[in-house]
C-alpha cells in the first residue's frame, strides 16, 4: 500500500512539521523564520521551504485570531462595534498618564 503525504508537508522539507500548539508559539516561530529569511543566508531551496512554512504559520495564526474573535462575539453578545477615529482618539488621551 502506498504512503500518502500530508498535504503541504514534504518528508525532505525540514521546515515542515506539525503546527505549533498555540498562537504565541506560531507567531514566535514565524518571527524567527522571517529573521532567517531576511538574513539572506538561506539557499534557494531553504528559502522556498521557509516560505511554505511561513505561509502555513500565517494561515494558522489567522485561524486562531478568527476563533478568538468569534469567542469575543459570543461573550459580548455580538454587540461589537467598529472602532471609529473619534473613539480611538478619545481612548488615546490617557496614554500620557
UniProtKB/Swiss-Prot annotation:
Tell me its EC number(s), please: 3.1.11.6
Among the record's GO biological process terms, what is one? DNA catabolic process
Spell out where the chain crosses the membrane: none
Q: Name one Pfam family in it.
A: Exonuc_VII_S
The entry's localization annotation reads:
Cytoplasm
Q: Which domain of life is it from?
A: Bacteria
* Keywords linked to the UniProt accession: Cytoplasm, Exonuclease, Hydrolase, Nuclease
Look up the record and report any one GO term of the cellular component aspect.
cytosol
Enzyme kind, highest EC tier: hydrolase
Q: Which reaction does it catalyse?
A: Exonucleolytic cleavage in either 5'- to 3'- or 3'- to 5'-direction to yield nucleoside 5'-phosphates
| Region (Disordered) residue spans | 1-21
InterPro entries, per the entry: Exonuc_VII_S, Exonuc_VII_ssu_sf
This entry's Gene Ontology molecular function terms read: exodeoxyribonuclease VII activity
Could you tell me which PANTHER family the record lists for this protein? EXODEOXYRIBONUCLEASE 7 SMALL SUBUNIT
Q: What does this protein do?
A: Bidirectionally degrades single-stranded DNA into large acid-insoluble oligonucleotides, which are then degraded further into small acid-soluble oligonucleotides.
* Family (UniProt): Belongs to the XseB family.
Q: How does this protein assemble?
A: Heterooligomer composed of large and small subunits.
What protein is this chain from? Exodeoxyribonuclease 7 small subunit
Organism, by scientific name, is Burkholderia mallei (strain ATCC 23344)
